[in-house]
Every structure is written in structure tokens, then in C-alpha cells.
Amino acid sequence: MKKNRLTHLKALEAESIQIMREVAAEFDNPVMLYSVGKDSSVLLHLARKAFYPGKIPFPLLHVDTNWKFKEMIAFRDNIAKKYDFDLLVHKNPRGMEMGISPFEHGSAKHTDIMKTEGLKQALDKYGFDAAFGGARRDEEKSRAKERVYSFRDKKHRWDPKNQRPELWNIYNAKVDRGESIRVFPLSNWTELDIWQYIYQEDIEMVPLYFAKKRPVVERDGALIMVDDERMPLKEGEVPEMKMVRFRTLGCYPLTGAIESQATTLPEIIQEMLLTTTSERQGRVIDNDSAGSMEKKKMEGYF
């Protein structure tokens, strides 16, 4: 007699859905952080599956830095309208008043004020006690040691030495008033898993992930796309049309593209099978020695 076995992707899907349902049942006011990227798109798809045929029982929160790619914002608004979920968009008002820019103020200050502080403001404003995120352990070394339930203190800080053990699929959801957790249902997924699942489930993606001729300039070894007129060109710089795509998405001045011919999901998957570099190599903030990912997370970053 044949036994029905879960495929690798089905097992990952089942684990993620179980985590989402458990958080929705145990916490008073959860939220899903929606950055519009591939991992967020998979999270949204899983949430729709987890609570089907009902509506997703928590809102989605986008912390907008005012420097996201135009295509990301258009995609966000279109998806929110299509699937009718509650979308909250927060911009740090202090940062907006100060005119914080990655060009004028640098990547570290921009990330701290517009992302980290903006996120903490939104979590405090709405009183969320659990926040789903799309981080995966294979992305970066500080994320590799983070729990599925990542506990944060009353100031949203992460202490890697003060986390709770997770035995099998048993999670400790007890928090004191004012404390919260960040929940990572995709912890055990890899970048390749994400793309294979997107292909299997036919999930809509931001076009920036697919190769296309785009205007870019090379700065410090990164291909930066000229997305709007706010990007100041250095002396002698002339945008060049190159066939590029993005493996990861963030603020456009801080996100490097890669040269690629992958215009379809199968081609992207084939590219992933052959790549030997991290997807976050294109993130300028990860190369900022003054602000490592672990330090950012200890200050309240995603």
C-alpha cells in the first residue's frame, strides 16, 4: 500500500501555514509586514491559503521609505485592490520632515530613520503584538540564528542571547505587556524554494525580478537603476541601458541589479541552480560595516 508523502514544497507550505494559524490564534493583534518583494508575495499567498475561504484576519503593513521603486508601489496598490486585504502604509513623519535621503544622509542613517524607526512607530501606533516577516535563515548569518518566534522587548530590540528554545514545532508564545514577537514562517525555506513555489503556485511578482533593459549606472561595483529624477548623477556618469534584473528589492538607490537574461520563472530557477553568491549581495546596507544586520536587528530592524 502506497503512503501519501508530502513533497518538499508541500512540507514547507504546511509548516508555514501551521505557524500562521497558531499566531493568529494566540496573539491579540498580529500584523504581516509586506515589503512587496518575492518573500512577502509568498507570505501573502500562504496567508490567503491558511484562512481560506475567509478573509486574512490581520492587516498588512508596508513601511514606506519614500525611496521604493515606482513599480513596487504600483504593484502593492494593485495587489491590495485585487485581493481586498487591509493595507496599512506608514512613513516616518519625522524623516519626511527632515527630507531624509540615502544620497544626502547615507545608507545607515536612511535605513535607521526611515525603516527601523518607521517600523517601530507603526508597531506602537497600532499596538501590534506579533509581526510576520519574510526573512529566511539562508539569507544572512544573523538571520540564520534567529528563531521562528523572535522575541522583542518593549523597545522592539532583539537580544540573540535571550531567545527561547524551539523544540520540533512547539513554540512559546507567552509575552509580557508591551513585548512582542517577530514571526518568520519562511525560516526554513531557501531562495530556490521560494522561486520554485512561486512557479508551482503561479504567484504574481513585481516585474523588477525579471530581466529587462533598464537604465543603470555602476557605483562601487553595484548596478544602480535610475528610477526617477531624484537620483543625482556624478560627474561623467551617463545611465546605460543594460539587460538586468533584481534578486532582492529595497530602496532603489541602495539596491544593486544583476546582469541577466532570465525573463521567465523557469529561467530564474535555472539561474538560481547555478549561482554561487548570496541574493543580498546587491543590498548596499549589508556592506555598511558601521551597521551590520545583527546590529540593525538589535535596534529593532526587521
Curated annotation (Swiss-Prot):
Recorded catalytic activity of this chain's protein: sulfate + ATP + H(+) = adenosine 5'-phosphosulfate + diphosphate
Pathways involved: Sulfur metabolism; hydrogen sulfide biosynthesis; sulfite from sulfate: step 1/3
Record's keyword annotation contains ATP-binding: yes
Assigned keywords, A-Z: ATP-binding, Nucleotide-binding, Nucleotidyltransferase, Transferase
A single BP term in Gene Ontology: sulfate assimilation
InterPro entries on file: PAPS_reduct_dom, Rossmann-like_a/b/a_fold, SO4_adenylTrfase_ssu, Sulfate_adenylyltrnsfr_sub2
E.C. numbers: 2.7.7.4
GO molecular function, one term: sulfate adenylyltransferase (ATP) activity
Entry superkingdom: Bacteria
Enzyme class: transferase
UniProt key word Transferase: yes
Pfam family, one: PAPS_reduct
Family, similarity comment: Belongs to the PAPS reductase family. CysD subfamily.
Subunit-structure text: Heterodimer composed of CysD, the smaller subunit, and CysN.
Function as written in the Swiss-Prot or TrEMBL entry: With CysN forms the ATP sulfurylase (ATPS) that catalyzes the adenylation of sulfate producing adenosine 5'-phosphosulfate (APS) and diphosphate, the first enzymatic step in sulfur assimilation pathway. APS synthesis involves the formation of a high-energy phosphoric-sulfuric acid anhydride bond driven by GTP hydrolysis by CysN coupled to ATP hydrolysis by CysD.
Protein name, as recorded: Sulfate adenylyltransferase subunit 2
